């Protein structure tokens, strides 16, 4: 089996709000139809799908309805990412210390899906080196 693309798909009752939020967070754009929106990142890669779920009930992290899935967005400037997320309609759920060398904050997107903004995690080259040196 060859996987040619993997995409996270969120349910949402308000397709335009949810897809616009994620397109703005990723610096990308949205392709729309009546029941499914495709979110592309700034480089034009298909990253997120948003499907119409008129009766969608958002997760209530951490205690209520289960979160099902969440995204981690790793950034170099956590304060700027926080400001952008909140300006776009994210709701902070759990604070983190943006002055710490490594950490994360938890938010809910407009449809209530939790996501994290993290910083100080290994860069892609470090991850590739680790995987190259630790394969069986």
Language model features with spans:
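Short, compact, well-ordered microdomains
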Residues: 91-119
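A short, acidic/glycine-rich surface segment
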Residues: 55-60, 125-126
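A short, polar/charged loop-to-alpha-helix boundary motif
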Residues: 121-136
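Active-site-proximal flexible loops/turns
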Residues: 18, 84, 116
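Polar/charged alpha-helical tracts
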Residues: 80-83, 87, 129-133
């Amino acid at each position: 089996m060859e996987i040619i693309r993997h995409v996270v798909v969120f349910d949402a009752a308000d397709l335009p709000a949810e897809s616009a939020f994620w397109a703005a967070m990723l610096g990308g754009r949205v392709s729309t139809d009546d029941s499914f929106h495709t979110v592309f990142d700034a480089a034009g890669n298909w990253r997120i799908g948003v499907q119409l779920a008129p009766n969608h009930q958002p997760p209530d992290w951490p205690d209520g309805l289960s979160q099902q899935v969440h995204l981690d967005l790793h950034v170099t400037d956590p304060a700027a990412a926080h400001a952008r997320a909140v300006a776009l309609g994210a709701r902070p759920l759990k604070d983190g210390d943006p002055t710490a060398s490594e950490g994360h904050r938890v938010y809910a997107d407009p449809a209530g899906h939790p996501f994290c903004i993290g910083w100080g995690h290994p860069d892609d080259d470090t991850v590739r080196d680790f995987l190259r040196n630790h394969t069986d």
